[in-house]
């Protein structure tokens, strides 16, 4: 059985995601291949609240070609590229069933990513760039370019290393190689104009109280079934699109209450002082990327400490968000060969608390992240405990 692993956020699910799934199956050469996605939960990689709850996004995906959806724990989902990629790739690997890894790429020559995956950044160049005030992604790109000695066009290498999606793709490859996963890797060029960012922009332009306004904006860029899931969930008042402004206002209040921010994850290099001085106003700066600022704020809001991020490098469980009929069979096989506990319901974690303190710490961080999300999406606190896996036929 071929099982294609896909790392995604589905924020929200759009036509580009559907295209990637169909292309992955074509490249694998098996239209019946199982598609397993590991996806972000309440917070996404760039540090923001997801546009809709994870169970809604999982259902969108399951009705559009995904067979099994599992959740990437908060500590990896809301993290820099390397940590995000490493956590997601390892989670797919530890299911024991994934054979292939597919992801989208933006670069003109995807093969350059395989070559760059073997290049280690020049540490001296990295340190110098950081000391000169460059953001970490920019400094890392400079250090990679300096260390690269291959035959590709230097301008192509430079352009590739300055594209966020290419950096993510590069980190997927690096993680898969480092872990000796044996995954067959499929890099799929993205279709122009199809991105979650463009979908969210259209959503922001719509009258969020009007289903017809939202439908008009998103028709054609979200698959019909995925759009239907989002609209029906909003109309039934299962959630409201998260109120980012209220979230940031509460973050500002917390900053004023906290005497020391430096212990929270991603608050190093003077970011704590910058946030304290600017949280109520303009957070744009050339020294820190917005994703890093948002991840630091998310860590503060959830209580995630820098020491925890430093110590915990591995996912401790496989949280199942949903599955199709084909996915049900895959999960049955997973139950025999997975190298992590499988949690179909939140209550499954409680049985492992006493014997696995690392699982307890990671799961309780997830619970808190979910409750914070619920606060800004008009959802019930503790909804995670009442959330069974989504099942679609």
Which residues fall in each region the model found?
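A glycine-rich helix N-cap at a beta->alpha junction
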Residues: 58-73
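N-terminal cationic-hydrophobic initiation segments that often serve targeting/anchoring roles
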Residues: 25-29, 62, 92-93, 177
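Conserved acidic residues
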Residues: 2, 33, 67, 98-99
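Active-site cores that bind ATP or allylic diphosphates and position pyrophosphate for catalysis
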Residues: 71-393
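N-terminal catalytic cores of NTP/NDP-binding nucleotidyl/phosphoryl-transfer enzymes
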Residues: 1-57
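Acidic, Ser/Thr-rich peripheral helices and adjacent loops at domain boundaries
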Residues: 56-59, 124-125
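Generic structural signal for well-ordered secondary structure
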Residues: 50-54, 62, 81, 85
């Amino acid at each position: 059985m071929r099982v294609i692993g896909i790392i995604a956020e589905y924020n929200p699910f759009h036509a580009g995601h559907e295209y990637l799934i169909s292309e992955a199956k074509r490249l694998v050469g098996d239209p019946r291949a199982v598609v397993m996605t590991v996806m972000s939960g309440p917070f996404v990689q760039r540090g923001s609240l997801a546009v809709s709850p994870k169970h809604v996004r999982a259902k969108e995906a399951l009705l559009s070609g995904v067979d099994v959806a599992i959740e990437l724990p908060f500590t990896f989902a809301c993290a820099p590229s390397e940590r995000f990629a490493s956590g997601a790739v390892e989670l797919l690997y530890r299911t024991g069933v994934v054979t292939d890894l597919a992801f989208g790429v933006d670069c003109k020559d995807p093969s350059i990513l395989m070559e760059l995956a073997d290049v280690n950044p020049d540490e001296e160049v990295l340190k110098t760039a950081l000391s000169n005030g460059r953001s970490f992604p920019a400094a890392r790109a400079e250090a990679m370019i300096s260390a690269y000695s291959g035959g590709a066009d230097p301008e192509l290498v430079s352009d590739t290393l300055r594209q966020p999606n290419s950096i993510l793709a590069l980190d997927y490859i690096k993680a898969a190689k480092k872990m000796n996963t044996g995954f067959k890797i499929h890099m799929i060029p993205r279709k122009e104009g199809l991105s979650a960012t463009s979908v969210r922009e259209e959503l922001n332009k719509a009258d969020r109280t009007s289903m017809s306004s939202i439908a008009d904006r998103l028709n054609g860029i979200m698959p019909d079934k995925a759009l239907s899931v989002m609209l029906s969930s909003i109309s039934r008042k299962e959630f409201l699109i998260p109120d980012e402004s209220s979230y940031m206002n509460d973050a500002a209040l917390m900053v004023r209450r906290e005497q020391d921010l430096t212990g929270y994850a991603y608050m190093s290099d003077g970011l704590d002082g910058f946030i304290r001085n600017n949280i109520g106003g303009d957070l744009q700066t050339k020294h820190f990327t917005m994703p890093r600022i948002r991840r630091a704020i998310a860590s503060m809001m959830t209580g995630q400490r820098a020491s925890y991020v430093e110590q915990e490098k591995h996912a401790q469980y496989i949280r199942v968000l949903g599955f199709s009929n084909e996915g049900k069979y895959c999960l049955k096989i997973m139950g025999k060969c997975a190298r992590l506990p499988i949690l179909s319901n939140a209550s499954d974690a409680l049985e492992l608390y006493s014997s696995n303190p690392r699982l307890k710490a990671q799961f309780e961080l997830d619970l808190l992240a979910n409750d914070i999300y619920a606060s800004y999406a008009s959802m019930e606190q503790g909804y995670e405990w009442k959330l069974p896996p989504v099942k679609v036929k």
